[in-house]
Amino acid sequence: MAKQKIRIRLKAYEHRILDQSADKIVETAKRTGATISGPIPLPTERTVYTVLSSPHKFKKAREQFEMRTHKRLIDIVNPTPKTVDSLMKLDLPSGVDIEIKL
């Protein structure tokens, strides 16, 4: 495999789980002899929902809820076949969304 790059994007609502998953991926890739760039923290997406706190009246009384989506980016440069196999077998928590591009 000459000059290939695997780009892994991780998304999660909790940053602790996200960082643990990124550390697992980096450790696995380093153990197999690949060169790694990252984890790079990307901007956090913040979605705010405003709802009325009373069912009928009192329009001024409102509550705001927010969801934060944390993101990380990991680049694996010159991956070996062993790296790809070990990444496929890696078990990550269910709260982490993974996108892999070759």
Swiss-Prot record:
It comes from the Bacteria. Keywords: Ribonucleoprotein, Ribosomal protein. One of its GO terms (cellular component) is ribonucleoprotein complex. Transmembrane segments: none annotated. Gene3D superfamilies: Ribosomal protein S10 domain (3.30.70.600). Involved in the binding of tRNA to the ribosomes. Part of the 30S ribosomal subunit. This is Small ribosomal subunit protein uS10. It comes from Pediococcus pentosaceus (strain ATCC 25745 / CCUG 21536 / LMG 10740 / 183-1w). The lineage of its organism: Bacteria, Bacillati, Bacillota, Bacilli, Lactobacillales.
